[in-house]
Swiss-Prot record:
<dbReference type="GO" id="GO:0009253">
    <property type="term" value="P:peptidoglycan catabolic process"/>
</dbReference>
<dbReference type="GO" id="GO:0016998">
    <property type="term" value="P:cell wall macromolecule catabolic process"/>
</dbReference>
<keyword id="KW-0326">Glycosidase</keyword>
<keyword id="KW-0929">Antimicrobial</keyword>
<comment type="function">
    <text>Has antibacterial activity against Gram-positive bacteria. No activity against S.aureus. Does not appear to have chitinase activity.</text>
</comment>
<feature type="signal peptide">
    <location>
        <begin position="1"/>
        <end position="13"/>
    </location>
</feature>
<dbReference type="GO" id="GO:0007165">
    <property type="term" value="P:signal transduction"/>
</dbReference>
<dbReference type="GO" id="GO:0050830">
    <property type="term" value="P:defense response to Gram-positive bacterium"/>
</dbReference>
<keyword id="KW-0081">Bacteriolytic enzyme</keyword>
<comment type="similarity">
    <text>Belongs to the glycosyl hydrolase 25 family.</text>
</comment>
<dbReference type="GO" id="GO:0031640">
    <property type="term" value="P:killing of cells of another organism"/>
</dbReference>
<keyword id="KW-0378">Hydrolase</keyword>
<protein>
    <recommendedName>
        <fullName>Lysozyme 1</fullName>
        <ecNumber>3.2.1.17</ecNumber>
    </recommendedName>
</protein>
<feature type="domain" description="Ch-type lysozyme">
    <location>
        <begin position="14"/>
        <end position="211"/>
    </location>
</feature>
<dbReference type="InterPro" id="IPR017853">
    <property type="entry name" value="Glycoside_hydrolase_SF"/>
</dbReference>
<dbReference type="InterPro" id="IPR051595">
    <property type="entry name" value="GH25_Enzymes"/>
</dbReference>
<feature type="active site">
    <location>
        <position position="18"/>
    </location>
</feature>
Amino acid sequence: MFALFLCIALASAKLGIDVSQPTSTSSFTCLRNKGFTTMVIVRAWKSTGSFDTNAPQTLKNANAAGFSIENSDVYYYPCISCGNMAGQVRTFWQKVGQYSLKVKRVWFDIEGTWTSSVSTNQNYLMQMMNEARAIGIVHGIYGSKYYWGNLFGSSYKYAYASSTPLWYPHYDNSPSFSDFSSFGGWTSPSMKQYRGDVSVCSAGVDYNYKP
């Protein structure tokens, strides 16, 4: 009975992918045929502090393969050493308009190496997120309990966590939230990246799940 329940749960799970490299229509079609049909997330801002000019065509390819705009997001990886966190967000949003990107949500990627000061990191985070809110960007946050604690302190709670979707990584190859542990003010996630750096369908992707 448990095995049957598990099969039904996996069959009804909503699976998708995220990509950081140019990806063709044929690759997206192949991925959809493998069951990754719910969402696609494309990198649009790089850690070098520049717009990813591959994003517009990759999104077009995803749309051509059957991913609707409603199911198409982008992610934003901030450049910490560049400073001017609010300015980066403004420049990014100008590029989104310039390239006429049609996406549902922007995910702000919170990981990696920032500064050695948690207070500085907290300030950088709020500069970035306050600018996104001021502009009116529909957004969420990508982050893990591990990086959150390292960057901001384990007790730090994001002021807008209750109204901001959370996408978290845990590479346990399990499309479920059974492993989630609260952090940063979030008591439940919206999406999980459950497997990373997969080579499939002539593309490099990460696997994602949402209920």
